[in-house]
UniProtKB/Swiss-Prot annotation:
<comment type="function">
    <text>Gibberellin-regulated protein that may function in hormonal controlled steps of development such as seed germination, flowering and seed maturation.</text>
</comment>
<comment type="similarity">
    <text>Belongs to the GASA family.</text>
</comment>
<dbReference type="GO" id="GO:0005739">
    <property type="term" value="C:mitochondrion"/>
</dbReference>
<dbReference type="GO" id="GO:0009741">
    <property type="term" value="P:response to brassinosteroid"/>
</dbReference>
<dbReference type="GO" id="GO:0009505">
    <property type="term" value="C:plant-type cell wall"/>
</dbReference>
<keyword id="KW-0732">Signal</keyword>
<dbReference type="InterPro" id="IPR003854">
    <property type="entry name" value="GASA"/>
</dbReference>
<dbReference type="GO" id="GO:0005576">
    <property type="term" value="C:extracellular region"/>
</dbReference>
<feature type="signal peptide">
    <location>
        <begin position="1"/>
        <end position="23"/>
    </location>
</feature>
<keyword id="KW-0939">Gibberellin signaling pathway</keyword>
<dbReference type="GO" id="GO:0009740">
    <property type="term" value="P:gibberellic acid mediated signaling pathway"/>
</dbReference>
<dbReference type="GO" id="GO:0009739">
    <property type="term" value="P:response to gibberellin"/>
</dbReference>
<dbReference type="Pfam" id="PF02704">
    <property type="entry name" value="GASA"/>
</dbReference>
<protein>
    <recommendedName>
        <fullName>Gibberellin-regulated protein 1</fullName>
    </recommendedName>
</protein>
<dbReference type="GO" id="GO:0009737">
    <property type="term" value="P:response to abscisic acid"/>
</dbReference>
<dbReference type="GO" id="GO:0009826">
    <property type="term" value="P:unidimensional cell growth"/>
</dbReference>
<keyword id="KW-0964">Secreted</keyword>
């Protein structure tokens, strides 16, 4: 009888732990890439429309967009709307994203 109670208790604890791990995996998948992807091409066209060097701007913006899945609104600034976009830097420490 004591063995069966211990077995049932350990089985219930195992199921609880399994449920918690599964919920954590689902949450991390939602945060890390299964979110709705934005159209980087059109977002970067809007971002770079006033740039003096449009090809360079589109290339840098596209790279940043694919990594971060966001582009700040407007043609300049607004980095607070997309923290990942603002945090990417070149080897020299300058902002990578336009």
């Amino acid at each position: 009888m004591a063995i069966s109670k211990a077995l049932i208790a350990s089985l219930l604890i195992s199921l609880l732990v399994l449920q918690l791990v599964q919920a954590d995996v689902e949450n991390s998948q939602k945060k890390n890439g299964y979110a709705k992807k934005i159209d980087c091409g059109s977002a970067c066209v809007a971002r770079c429309r006033l740039s003096r060097r449009p090809r360079l701007c589109h290339r840098a913006c596209g790279t940043c967009c694919y990594r971060c899945n966001c582009v700040p609104p407007g043609t300049y600034g607004n980095y607070d709307k997309c923290q990942c976009y603002a945090s990417l830097t070149t080897h020299g420490g300058r902002r990578k994203c336009p």
